[in-house]
Design a protein with these regions (language model features):
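Sec-dependent signal peptide recognition
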Residues: 2-8
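Absolute protein N-terminus
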Residues: 1-2, 143
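Phosphoinositide-dependent membrane-docking surfaces
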Residues: 91
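Lipid interaction determinants
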Residues: 17-86, 100-143
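Short, conserved beta-turn/loop elements at beta-strand boundaries and strand-helix junctions
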Residues: 94-98
Length: 143
């Protein structure tokens, strides 16, 4: 009985020591895979479109993503006088293709999801995109 218990304890100890290392390498290869997929998309460049707005005809938007993880976001409220805004900051990927754009001067954050190499879509911080009839109006297309 004592021998069976001893063998079981040894087996658990050996197996327990080996698992975290394998789990860590699986996480690293998953991150590497995501990075390679993003590189293959060639998502750097300028994306343009007109986003919906409640108080004007729309917001003409241009988002430029640079390969040094910086961005420029230009927003023009159509039909409004003196309503052009430009923000600059850095972006990083939160989960797969979800980008968080951070503006250092105001601590504001916005989120875009890369759909493919030619389109990004305005999103929330969880990566949820509009699926309704207005979904196409939240897409910016690469110039």
């Amino acid at each position: 009985m004592k021998i069976n218990f001893l063998w079981t304890a040894c087996l658990i100890a050996i197996t327990g020591c080996d698992s975290p290392q394998n789990h860590h390498s699986r996480i690293e290869s998953g991150e590497t895979k995501t990075e390679k997929q993003l590189e293959n998309l060639n998502f750097y460049g300028t994306y343009e479109g007109i986003l919906p707005a409640a108080d004007c005809e729309g917001i003409r938007t241009a988002l430029t993503l640079n390969n040094d993880n910086t961005y420029v976001l230009r927003s023009e409220y159509i039909g409004e006088k003196d309503a052009i805004f430009e923000s600059k900051g850095s972006y990083h990927f939160i989960n797969g293709r979800l980008m968080e754009l951070a503006q250092p001067s105001s601590n504001e954050k916005s989120y875009y999801k890369i759909l493919d190499g030619s389109k990004v879509m305005l999103s929330d911080k969880e990566g949820t995109v509009n699926q309704g009839v207005l979904a196409e109006y939240y897409i910016l297309k690469k110039k």
